[in-house]
Amino acid sequence: VRAAGKRVLYQPASVVIHYEGISHGTDTGSGVKAHQVDNQKKFYKRWADELGTRHLDNAVNPFRARDRSIHQKTILVVDHYVPQPDRDAGSRSIWCFLREFKAMGLNVKFWPANLWHDPQYTALLQQEGIEVYYGNEYAGRFAEWVQEHGANLDYVLLSRPHVAQEHLDPVRAHTRAKVLFYGHD
């Protein structure tokens, strides 16, 4: 579809569930599964050009591979919470920044300092193709996350003085990203 010049859309809220071996077992030496090995070779042969230019090898840099951002610059935006653009001017500003960064072709990540999943606005950002980090699994782990993924960040926008103060040191220590600051008021 892409090769034909068509737009490809995906649904960020979609879920793929796969139970390996439930339908036909796991033995590739017999039965229907015996075709799996041959079909895998045919698949790689058919899609070799695409896999070689637009994809990374298996398990190489999943941060970039999972959202096909191999050839894009990545920006991480950090603000105090998921913006609510119809409720306050600061949120409106950040919302516009996020959408504009996406329109510029950047791979956009958003880290709300409070890590709260706003059921309305988080989903809207995700529908725009913006990855939003939230939940207990990230609590107290910003520095660790930046240490692990900092090499993939080209820009970091820190919003508001108290947010910048809390997040600047790990960004400087673990990335070569250009740091931007937006102070609001």
Residue ranges and their predicted role:
Residues R68-Y81, M104-G105:
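A short, charged/proline- and glycine-enriched loop
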